[in-house]
């Protein structure tokens, strides 16, 4: 392998991967999701987007320090990546948010993947010699039935995630149109307060 080839690989890794966790980044996510949407339209089938936000991550970051928050993010990333069906389909969106794309090949594993993620977050994480719990909330949207563009799917997954957070956190909510209208009303009320 030549130096030029190694340099090219390094540039691609920097462009596509999150520097902290090694997961793919938001830019790569948008490219991959667009490709998955096209595949499901062309060949049929269904996919799903799982939008994960860590609950009360700020408390760990502020209480233990950012270096331990970073360690937790790395540990969570590594653990998510080890779940069968997730592997290279996990992306760090920034901060404490992650997205998993399940293409039509993985959609049959949706319930098992959700259970594996719940199990992962039901256990403590070892930080600074002690156990700390960090739960997650998740919004799930299916494609192309509930959306067929990157922007629409992110918006709907975020709405489902918001519903999970508002329902007490540490939950998984599937997108539904009734949730969307309720979320928009709640956002309008909060904005006008």
Describe the role of every protein-language-model region.
Residues 76-81, 109-127, 156:
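Alpha-helical scaffold within the catalytic cores of cyclic-nucleotide enzymes
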Residues 90, 116, 120, 130-131, ...:
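Cyclic nucleotide signaling catalytic output domains
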Residues 72, 99-119, 131-132, 140:
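Short helix/loop segment flanking the catalytic signature motif in cyclic-nucleotide metabolism enzymes
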Residues 53, 57, 76, 98, ...:
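Hydrophobic framework residues that shape the active-site pocket
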Residues 16, 34, 38, 77-108, ...:
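Conserved helix-loop-beta segment at the catalytic/binding core of cyclic-nucleotide signaling proteins
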Residues 1-19, 26-38, 88-89, 181:
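Signal-transducing coiled-coil linker helices
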Residues 12-31, 52-66, 74:
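Conserved nucleotide-binding and Mg2+-coordinating catalytic segments in signaling enzymes
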Residues 1-2, 54-55, 178:
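PAS/PAC or PAS-like capping segment
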